[in-house]
């Protein structure tokens, strides 16, 4: 099968391209720019385009399929040529569904927790040598690729993202997978550039639950009131299976999970991660892993890439980096670190970097998000606001939104860096939360602060 990728350099797109190459397909692609790690991974497989840009001459009737990435625009020259030739054009999720029509599809959805839960499930399967197909949004320890597709495996585990499918298909990705087994971890308004109201956002999850095949199941977080409402209101003929955060204790900085065999030391921490673990456990049991085998495997799970990643530790201090940027994730992550290191002063730093977080109307959703921190810092770049064509936000708006009088706010990366590097980190816990990099912060240098 000959497949051409328009915008092959994307995080998801290049992984799908590599997965199809590994499956024996003929794969080509184009993009106007490609950064690492995508660039080096594509190069290793011989899939890196010879030149960057869009080349309509690459599109011919010999192609069996076009996979269109979100980075491409609706007037992309290659897309227009493919439409002119009447070629079959798939969005990323559409093509994944085509590859998994004859498998049991396990789809993990939710505003937060989906990457971690998907990673937990795959870790458990890998630990017990159970081979499954998958697509996950983070690099996992022990896994070479983030997408795997085979002809033989019975199960495919898919991280179900609610963002749009492609420039010409405005449906959320997770509407296209038609799960047999689904999980819903949480609903907290996000992506306001495409879901302008809370009700509009919640509606996408209702559609997701109704897309589960007849006789399938939804495992859902019963502690999230919106999730419970959405699932319980659905008239789809599916099994509805609630889960709750398991009992656990924290002793001397170590989390102990209560199991039928007694307390089990685990590597992850925080109530939100224990809640994720409960969901992963039920999905693994649906996939044939018994409870004891799940506990044995999950004890060795260190977390998904970029999620509560410990970057430095000394005798008296510790530093974590986390991808958290939405209000619910920021709140859960900050609470988790404080609960784990109650005896340390927590310095929590958040970069407002996404379209939603830099929107003056949406800012109020961050109310109380940093309350668990002893020292709370917010950084944002005026350049990021300008690039996203948003109205400027002021220090006063941010302070008012977080409802914290002692909030420290920076919009200059050098001033933020000066603050950070002037701190005494004795008996401190440092938490850096962002989907960006604080205007070019050297994380290796940050590690040196704790030595």
Region locations from a protein language model:
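ATP-dependent carboxylate-amine ligase
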Residues: 1-34, 42-49, 62-66, 82-87, ...
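Short N-terminal binding/cap micro-motifs at the start of the first secondary-structure element
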Residues: 12-15, 36-37, 142-143, 275
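Phosphate-binding loop of NTP-binding sites
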Residues: 19-23, 57-61, 70-220, 226-237, ...
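A conserved, hydrophobic alpha-helical segment in the catalytic core
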Residues: 20, 175-189, 228-229, 265-303
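Short, charged/polar "capping" segments at the starts of alpha-helices
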Residues: 34-39, 57-58, 73-76, 142-143, ...
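Active-site-proximal loop->helix
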Residues: 38-45, 102, 145-150, 310-311
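Beta-strand->loop->alpha-helix junctions that form or flank phosphate-binding loops
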Residues: 51-54, 90-94, 135-138, 234-252, ...
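Short pre-catalytic strand/loop immediately N-terminal to key active-site residues, enriched for Gly-Thr
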Residues: 264-269, 317-321
């Amino acid at each position: 099968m000959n497949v051409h990728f328009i915008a092959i350099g994307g995080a998801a797109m290049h992984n799908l391209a590599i997965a199809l190459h590994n499956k024996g397909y003929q794969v080509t692609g184009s993009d106007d720019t490609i950064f690492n790690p995508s660039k080096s991974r594509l190069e290793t497989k011989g899939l890196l385009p010879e030149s960057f840009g869009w080349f309509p001459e690459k599109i011919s009737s010999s192609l069996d399929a076009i996979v269109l990435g979100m980075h491409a625009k609706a007037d992309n020259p290659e897309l227009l040529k493919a439409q002119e030739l009447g070629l079959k054009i798939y969005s990323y999720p559409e093509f994944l569904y085509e590859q998994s029509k004859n498998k049991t599809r396990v789809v993990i959805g939710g505003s937060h927790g989906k990457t971690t839960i998907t990673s937990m499930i795959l870790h458990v399967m890998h630990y017990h040598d159970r081979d499954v197909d998958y697509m996950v949004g983070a690099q996992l320890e022990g896994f070479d690729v983030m997408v795997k597709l085979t002809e033989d495996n019975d199960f495919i585990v898919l991280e179900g993202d609610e963002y749009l499918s492609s420039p010409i298909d405005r449906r959320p990705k997770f509407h296209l997978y038609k799960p047999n087994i689904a999980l819903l971890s949480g609903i907290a308004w996000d992506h306001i550039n495409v879901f302008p109201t809370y009700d509009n956002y919640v509606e996408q999850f209702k559609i997701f639950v109704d897309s589960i095949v007849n006789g399938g199941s939804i495992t859902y977080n019963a502690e999230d009131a919106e999730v419970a409402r959405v699932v319980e209101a659905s008239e789809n003929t599916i099994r509805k299976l609630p889960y709750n955060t398991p009992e656990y204790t924290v002793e001397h900085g170590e989390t102990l999970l209560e199991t039928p065999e007694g307390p089990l030391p685990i590597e992850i921490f925080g109530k939100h991660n224990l809640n994720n673990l409960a969901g992963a456990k039920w999905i693994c049991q649906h996939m044939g892993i018994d409870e004891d085998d799940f506990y044995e495997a999950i004890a060795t799970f260190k977390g998904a890439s970029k999620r509560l990643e410990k970057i430095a530790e000394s005798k008296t201090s510790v530093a974590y980096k986390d991808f958290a940027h939405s209000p619910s994730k920021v709140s859960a992550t900050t609470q988790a670190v404080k609960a784990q290191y109650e005896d340390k002063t927590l310095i929590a730093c958040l970069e407002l970097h996404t379209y939603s977080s830099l929107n003056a109307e949406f800012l109020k959703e961050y109310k109380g998000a940093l309350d668990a921190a002893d020292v709370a810092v917010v950084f944002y770049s005026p350049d990021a606001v300008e690039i996203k064509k948003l109205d400027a936000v002021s220090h006063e708006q941010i302070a008012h939104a977080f409802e914290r009088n002692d909030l420290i706010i920076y919009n200059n990366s050098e001033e933020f860096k000066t603050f950070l590097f002037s701190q005494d980190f004795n008996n401190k816990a440092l938490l850096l939360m962002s989907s960006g990099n604080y205007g070019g912060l050297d994380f290796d240098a940050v590690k040196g602060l704790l030595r």
